[in-house]
Regions:
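Conserved nucleotide-cofactor-binding alpha/beta core module
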Residues: 1-13
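Structural motif
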Residues: 3, 35-37
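Glycine- and acidic
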Residues: 6-7, 39-41
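Membrane-interfacial terminal anchoring regions of lipid-handling membrane enzymes
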Residues: 12-34, 43-246
């Protein structure tokens, strides 16, 4: 395991990033496996996007400025982890309202601890874990037109496509999207009983939201935030499928 240092300033940021990247390159060359998140922090709306800045950091440990060549020795393999239920969903919705209503709002270390504990130990329902194709294979297959030299943005997009294409979607995902659209596009993959259960679940999560004195939960806003969290994986996967067919 290794520590990603945050809240650094100026030149310290570059030095820490280079040191971490060099460590990762050395570890991979020694035959070790490393796991790293695709972005800093958590996606609040379940739209998973790889940060190009992360790929730039990973490339710092190589002896070339060519992004593709710099990342090649790391043997990057995208991994998709799908939860039926996100135990932190109400905390994310709560944070969205606080950011909307409280100028300059920032989470405290205690908030981070609650989020981490809830994310680890909270109930997730069914969980799917899919190991995708290596980045080198995604590049060589040419499923998407690529211009050389590859930019970190193009590489991030390839990683995202592989992750999104292997999402496991659950009834709650389709139901959330249909509730937002007001049309039952995906009725064939869920039942009225499923829909009733999801509606009850969403309302129960809103009840868990706790705001500072003087603020009232905006139930409609919170409801939409929660529905979007569960709908976005469907949209991301559909977008990837459409791009693949094009």
């Amino acid at each position: 395991s290794f520590l990603v240092r945050r809240n650094l300033q100026g030149r310290e940021v570059l030095l820490a990033a280079r040191l971490l990247s060099e460590y990762m390159h050395d570890a991979i060359q020694e035959g070790k496996s490393l796991w790293i998140a695709q972005r800093e922090g958590r996606s609040k709306d379940s739209t998973d996007k790889t940060q190009p800045a992360l790929l730039k950091m990973l490339a710092l440990g190589a002896q070339t400025k060519d992004s593709e060549q710099a990342l090649s020795p790391l043997n990057i393999v995208p991994v998709t982890c799908s939860y039926e239920y996100d135990p932190c969903d109400y905390l994310k919705a709560q944070e969205m309202q606080l950011k909307r209503d409280v100028e300059g709002f920032k989470k405290s270390p205690a908030d981070d601890g609650i989020n981490m504990r809830t994310g680890i130990f909270g109930w997730k329902g069914e969980v799917s874990f899919h190991i995708g194709r290596p980045l080198s294979e995604l590049i060589s297959l040419g499923e998407v037109p690529l211009e050389r030299p590859l930019t970190v943005e193009a590489i991030a997009s390839l990683i995202d496509r592989e992750i999104h294409s292997h999402y496991k979607l659950f009834p709650i995902n389709y139901i959330a999207l249909d509730l937002i659209d007001g049309v039952e596009h995906h009725y064939g993959v869920y039942t009225e009983e499923d829909k009733s259960r999801v509606l009850q679940y969403i309302e129960s999560r809103i009840e868990l939201v706790r705001l500072p004195e003087g603020l009232e939960p905006d139930r409609e806003f919170l409801r939409r935030c929660l529905l979007m969290m569960y709908a976005n994986p469907v949209l991301s996967k559909l977008k990837t499928e459409l791009e693949t067919r094009a």
